[in-house]
């Protein structure tokens, strides 16, 4: 037996009843993830090697007589953490819709992945079922302050990976506005006064 991502080693030994006879060990059948040197097997199986692998090692004496050591190595699966495959969108523009879709894969066939928004700015909404992060930043969100994002992908075994990034929101020029209230009435022969006050975001 062997386990995915764990080093495997096995050394075949052979003897001959004929005193002083030389025995040569040859690897006849060996899976690709193993290296065989004079009957010594070493290697580390990966996720793609999970399953059964036949091995045949042949012992040959000086007279050409042979014997075989045949067995099967069963590589058991070890859970692999998910991998984020999407590239985060790290820039946004004030008053424009921002969208980023998180995607991920897992080397374990059939593994179920769950998305969650661990840290999400107030102007954004993360939908776990689709992996979509979207929202529209305002003038208050310009820059990077408060725009850190951490999204988490978790597999069925509880292994997780995070997609962490900061969004930089670019400013869009805002038109000025009046903050004063006009005086809309006046009295004959009385001085009329109104001071207009304007602001800009």
Identify the meaning behind each predicted range:
Residues 2-4, 18, 22, 29-78, ...:
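Acidic, turn/loop-rich segments in luminal/extracellular domains of secretory-pathway
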Residues 8:
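Single, function-defining residue in the core of a domain
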Residues 11-15, 101-105, 195-199:
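Short edge beta-strand/loop segments characteristic of extracellular beta-sandwich folds
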Residues 79-87, 173-181:
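Proline-enriched interdomain boundary motifs that mark the N-terminal boundary
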